[in-house]
């Protein structure tokens, strides 16, 4: 959001007075809150995506990946094109809006065994994976395998976790009639939240309402519960319970971009230190 909307404001300036360039490794802007709907098929991907050049017709756009920020030299290193050649881009002023990255290191095993919901590719991967689980569960004679295939675990009860759980539950309910060997009570959704309620960012009334809706839809809610470990076919919870599963979707844990970490910029708790105008001093 930050980079695109900063450029959107800047393009209102006199175009001949400034040379404004936006660099991104995607040539489209994606509205992340809609990714769960894309994953579930509720909306087409086009409803969540807008081409950047269409949004910013007056801005020079470069489809490239930034690999390094050289603050003292006042340039950035990018790789672009099919051959991924390095280029140096000089700047007078730099707006950094790289966002954060998923931190899969916070739980042992999470990095190797979970999905995330941050990109369009993530949404497609989760959708295709779930359909694959249904296909195999419909034909397998192995009851233990079937249970793992039909246990869906979402880690994190914030906005993304709740939306992901709700959308994928709706998608699964729509799929069930087409898989004759899968009974409704065999499909189980689980959401794990460390705090005492779902959607802790919102009011208690909304949290309680969401909890009631989830329980009504037979979604297992684990509150005041954390993951302690993750394996290829199982998660272990802090309450001593474990869940056999082939599907773990993590919506928790963010960390500062590696590029920011290596930039030499002043950081505190993984965030760039700025003044009240969001300027880095020094």
Predicted regions and their residues:
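Predominantly flavin-linked oxidoreductase catalytic cores and closely associated redox partners
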Residues: 112, 117-213, 217, 221-223
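FAD-site-proximal beta/loop scaffold in flavoenzymes
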Residues: 113-142, 242-282
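Short acidic/His/Gly/Ser-rich catalytic and metal-binding motifs that mark active-site loops
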Residues: 29-32, 103-106, 258-259
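FAD-binding core/adjacent interface of flavoenzyme oxidoreductases
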Residues: 60-153, 171, 249
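A conserved beta-strand/loop element that lines the FAD pocket in flavoprotein oxidoreductases
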Residues: 57-70, 215-230
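Beta1-alpha1 glycine-rich phosphate/pyrophosphate-binding loop at the start
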Residues: 1-68, 159-202
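Short glycine-enriched, charge-decorated loop/helix-capping segments at active-site entrances
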Residues: 35-41, 111-115, 206, 264-265
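Short glycine-rich anion-binding loops that position phosphate/pyrophosphate groups of nucleotides
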Residues: 99-102, 165, 254-255
């Amino acid at each position: 959001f930050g980079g695109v909307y900063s450029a959107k404001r800047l393009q209102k300036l006199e175009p001949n007075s400034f040379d404004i360039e936006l660099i991104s490794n995607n040539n489209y802007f994606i509205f992340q809150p809609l990714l769960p709907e894309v994953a579930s098929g509720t909306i087409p991907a086009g409803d969540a995506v807008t081409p950047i050049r269409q949004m910013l017709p007056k801005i020079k756009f470069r489809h490239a990946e930034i690999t390094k920020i050289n603050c003292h030299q006042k340039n950035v290193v990018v790789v672009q094109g099919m051959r991924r050649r390095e280029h140096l881009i000089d700047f007078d002023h730099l707006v950094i809006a790289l966002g954060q990255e998923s931190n899969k290191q916070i739980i042992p095993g999470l990095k190797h065994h979970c999905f995330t919901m941050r990109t369009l590719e993530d949404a497609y991967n989760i959708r295709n994976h779930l359909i694959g689980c249904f296909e195999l569960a419909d034909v397998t004679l192995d009851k233990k395998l079937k249970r793992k295939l039909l246990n869906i675990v979402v880690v994190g009860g914030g906005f993304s976790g709740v939306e992901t759980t709700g959308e994928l539950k709706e998608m699964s309910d729509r799929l069930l009639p087409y898989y004759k060997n899968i009974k409704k009570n065999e499909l189980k959704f689980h959401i794990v939240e460390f705090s005492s309620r779902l959607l802790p960012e919102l009011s208690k009334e909304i949290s309680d309402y969401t909890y009631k809706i989830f329980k009504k839809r037979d979604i297992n809610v684990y509150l005041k519960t954390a993951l302690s470990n993750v394996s290829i076919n199982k998660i272990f919870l802090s309450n001593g319970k474990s869940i056999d599963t082939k599907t773990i979707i993590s919506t928790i844990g963010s960390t500062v971009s590696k590029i920011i970490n290596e930039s030499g910029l002043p950081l505190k708790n993984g965030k760039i230190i700025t003044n009240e105008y969001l300027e880095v001093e020094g």
